[in-house]
Amino acid sequence: MIDSEALESERVKLKRDIADLRANLNRKEQCLRELEAAIAAGEDSDEAEESSNDMPTPQTKLTNDDIARYSRQLILQDFGVQGQLKLKNSSVLIVGMGGLGCPAAQYLVAAGCGHLGLIDYDEVERSNLHRQILHSEHRCGMSKAESARIALLELNSHCQIRCHSRLINSMNAMHIIRPYDVVLDCSDNVATRYLLNDACVMLRKPLVSGSALKMDGQLTVYGYGQGPCYRCIYPVPPPPEAVTNCGDGGVLGAVTGIIGAMQALEAIKVIIGLGDVMSGRLLIFDGSSFMFRNIRIRTKRPNCHVCSAQPLITELIDYEMFCGMHATDKDNPLDLLEPDQRLEVKEYHQKLQSQPHLLLDVRPPAEFEICQLPRSINVPLSEILDDSYLKRFAKQLEDKELPIVLLCRRGNDSQIAAQHIKNRFPAHSIRDLVGGLHAWTGSVDATFPIY
């Protein structure tokens, strides 16, 4: 007997795949045209990157165009001509051309930073566009570094921009960072934070660090003057299950814009010696109440493994191993459960879905409202961890034969929930869905929305 529902799902999936391929082809052709135009203009970033690590001869005079363009900041008493010249001769590396890196780069280029390095391994996606303001719809599929470079050169064609379209790691970090004066950590990634911190300490480069999640943001400067480094504050990385990125926790685009702009400001202050740099202090921004807090953080740790007088770490290490997590925010799956405690979405669809069971969706209510599987019940992870779900499901939990299936967006929070419930009810059949709703869309129902 023909399964019309399955055929319709496959038809929709094929149409979506064809549309995606056509859109990707159009994007690639547009990228090719733009890159060929850049090469023809003598601005090929790969050639620039391989040519030399030496920056051009310092400029000692502002041009008439410089004076006209930067006049509003030239007339600032503490900035002036000398400040503009320092900025013109400066070189800044931005690691991560996402929600933080885009506004930071935009303001640095607009202010007249002479040399900018952009590093990002990733390509532009539609889900980036609400906060990564240098990218555009027609550049989806293009390298983020190249996409940002195109937008920045439209803003200021006098800025020299190098693209590093690769993942920064222990093998290439020292070589990439060495020619730059200041580094901006816009990665929002724990393993990369430790990598950049250690490399910048070893190379004596100030590190302007920003982060943003949900409605909150933070900003500080590490390794500046006698201030602490990142390891002084966080000598031990957090457990992987305690880390949330904007892909899982969400973020409001304007929050990343605020923090990224402030990172640019701190970089400018470091370069020209302006004001009181945010070293030894942490700026905390709460977007929901629009409150800024400026708090003191600890001083340099005398026994810091990297920045102390006798460091234990004198060369870069394997930071993914050290942190127990990948150096990207792309599909970082947790591995908390044994294979027999997990359930593939196809197996669930084919066998268990038609049988009595309890399907608990542990996403927050806002995410559950976006989309949900039939018969699923929303029980946020927080309710499971504080055991407030027990009273609600007391009757079902009395039945040890009733299978309990945990579900989330990507299969991480569901593992945490399954582990917690299993510890409390070891005799019950408790499993989570591998890959969560993303896997459901990819393997079962192509019409199910992805976010």
Swiss-Prot record:
One of its GO terms (biological process) is protein urmylation. Pathway: tRNA modification; 5-methoxycarbonylmethyl-2-thiouridine-tRNA biosynthesis; Cofactor biosynthesis; molybdopterin biosynthesis. One of its GO terms (molecular function) is molybdopterin-synthase sulfurtransferase activity. ATP binds at residues 99, 120, 127-131, 144, 188-189. Residues 42-62 are annotated as: Disordered. Keywords: ATP-binding, Cytoplasm, Metal-binding, Molybdenum cofactor biosynthesis, Multifunctional enzyme, Nucleotide-binding, Nucleotidyltransferase, Phosphoprotein, Transferase, tRNA processing, Zinc. Residues 353-449 form the Rhodanese domain. This is Adenylyltransferase and sulfurtransferase MOCS3. It comes from Drosophila persimilis (Fruit fly). The gene is Uba4.
